[in-house]
Design a protein with these regions (language model features):
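Non-catalytic signal-transmission and effector/linker regions of two-component phosphorelay proteins
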Residues: 1-18, 24, 123-143
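Two-component/phosphorelay signaling modules centered on CheY-like receiver
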Residues: 24-42
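Residue-level signal for the "D+5" position in two-component response regulator receiver
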Residues: 43, 68-71, 109
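Acidic, metal-coordinating helix/loop segments flanking the phosphotransfer/catalytic sites
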Residues: 43-61
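Acidic catalytic/metal-coordinating carboxylates
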Residues: 46, 72-78
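His-Asp phosphorelay/catalytic-motif detector in bacterial-type signaling
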Residues: 58-60, 85-91
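Active-site residues of response regulator receiver
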Residues: 65, 96
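Alpha4 helix (beta4-alpha4-beta5 surface) of REC/receiver domains from two-component response regulators
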Residues: 75, 99-116
Length: 143
């Protein structure tokens, strides 16, 4: 687990990325991409599993599917924002197959920073991880 100020410069650049995705194939593809970029992925197949362990590990970025069994991604996002600590919630990026303007608006209004369609996410992921790495390093240097 990587915490603020811990480890070497190389470790400081490694992100912990939570992926909340019920499709095991997509979760594995994301894990491969995240690992290839030098980061760590923690996978969850449901919003309930994610929320039950949220806060136990340091997480820098959350990739959250909208269509999940049980609690959906929007409800999970709302719960995250309600329960966030004073330090704030990590950046949340919605990952979905739903190209739905209303869902996009609701997600962004509820604190998601981005709304990505799944096919596009794989093209966007390296840049997304790099920008988050830069932001995380800056936050660690200037707490």
């Amino acid at each position: 687990m990587i915490r603020s100020g811990a480890g070497t410069e190389q470790l400081a650049r490694q992100l912990s990325v939570a992926v909340v995705e019920d499709n095991p194939h997509i979760r594995q593809l994301l894990q491969d991409e995240i690992h290839d970029e030098g980061h760590r992925m923690i996978g969850f197949s449901s919003a309930e599993d994610f929320l039950a362990t949220y806060g136990e590990e340091s997480i820098d970025l959350i990739l959250l599917d909208l269509m999940l069994p049980g609690m959906d991604g929007l409800s999970c996002l709302q719960q995250l924002k309600i329960n966030q600590s004073q330090d704030g919630c990590p950046r949340v990026v919605i990952v979905t197959a739903l190209d739905d303007a209303e869902k996009r608006r609701i997600a962004l209004d509820n604190g998601a920073e981005e709304y990505n369609l799944k096919p596009d996410l794989f093209l966007r992921l390296p840049d997304l991880l790099q920008s988050e790495t830069t932001a995380t390093e800056e936050a660690r240097r200037h707490p």
